[in-house]
Amino acid sequence: MLVSPTAAATSIEQQTIRDLRSIVPQIDNLNDGYVLRWLRAKEGRFDETAESLKKHVTFRNAWHLDKIEQWTPPECLEKYCGYGLLGDTEGRPILMSLLGNVDVEGLLRSVASLDYIKFSLAAIEKGMKLCEEKAKESGRPFEQMTLVFDLENITSAHFSCKQFASSFTTLVSLFQDHYPLFLRKILIIRAPEMARIAYASITAILQDPITRLVEMPSESDWKWSLAQIVNLDAWPMYWGGNLVENGDPKCPSRIKYGGGAVDESYFVDPKKAMADYDQLTTVYAGDKHLIQIKVKRPSRISWTYMTDEDDIGFEIHYDKTGSCDKLTEMETVYPYIRLECTNVPITGHLDVTDVGNYVLEFDNYYSWFSAKQLRYNIEIEDL
């Protein structure tokens, strides 16, 4: 008999969670249901769960996810990215993403790839909060969410735009690494043939637990598939339900439709985006560029960077002892992220309270042939 992934914790699992808390103090602010989700995703493997949770907490801190509701996304994302949070027949959240309706080329000429990814993570975090609220109501240790992608109006740009392909792939990787056992189902509706071919081509990067959740019904069956998981009387008519809001079948108070070509007034001119920069360097193929910083008191490390072509990796390391000779011996405080940054600069910051040596790494080690010309600004200010 199959056991539900959201079943109550066994006595062994409860003890394992206590043991995890004793050696991973970083998870003190995570509830038991949250930790249980990770433990079950790792099939009870203690060391793997502990290491994954440490990395996850570092990721959440670096991306400021615990304060994501305080983040103000770029106006362009709010205006043109359609999504909404609804519920299934049992009141569990459904995140609807109107991915097909997005002008991906215009969007990524207007906002940083980091902000597009963060905007998507913010929606996922909202869904997670709703799951936690539902778990309190249901008495289960945690709840799961359904993700619906509507590909209506999808164009060849979704597959040919290099910046979007890179950003979306990064988003998928981050989701798989940091939101295990979070989804009940992934429903992809109104998918044309080219989308089905594209999906087949990306299955190589999808982990098996994710691929098992994916359902891509035919054009004639997608409404039926939705009807199996939602109350049609509480579901917008535009997506197969019976609900109309003030004559509008899209129910705009529930789903932000977005869409349309991004106005050129939002476009960033790459030649002017970083007219004032402190440093210019070339990171050769197979090489890295390292910047060492001495932090003497609690500080905020801020950065802005962009390349003249393609992507570049970025990571921040902390040398606890002050005597490490290799990056691999240091503690990662900002996890590695590889982003397209040719059109719009990447901007970010990290607050650090531990004094000592920090190393900012720009990585082009993965490239066999292409050198990257890199412009960047680094600032340090007291907290």
Swiss-Prot record:
Pfam families: CRAL_TRIO. Disruption phenotype: RNAi-mediated knockdown in cells of the pi uterine cell lineage impairs basement membrane (BM) sliding along each other and reduces the size of BM openings. Highly expressed in cells of the pi uterine cell lineage. GO terms for cellular component: cytoplasm; cytosol. It is found in: Cytoplasm, Cytosol. Residues 271-380 form the GOLD domain. It comes from the Eukaryota. Gene3D superfamilies: CRAL-TRIO lipid binding domain (3.40.525.10), GOLD domain (2.60.120.680). Keywords: Cytoplasm. InterPro entries: CRAL-TRIO_dom (IPR001251), CRAL-TRIO_dom_sf (IPR036865), CRAL/TRIO_N_dom_sf (IPR036273), GOLD_dom (IPR009038), GOLD_dom_sf (IPR036598), SEC14/CRAL-TRIO_domain (IPR051064). GO terms for biological process: regulation of basement membrane organization. Residues 73-247 form the CRAL-TRIO domain. Transmembrane segments: none annotated. The keyword Metal-binding does not apply. Vesicle trafficking protein. Functions in uterine cells to promote basement membrane (BM) mobility and BM gap formation during tissue remodeling. This is Protein ctg-1. It comes from Caenorhabditis elegans.
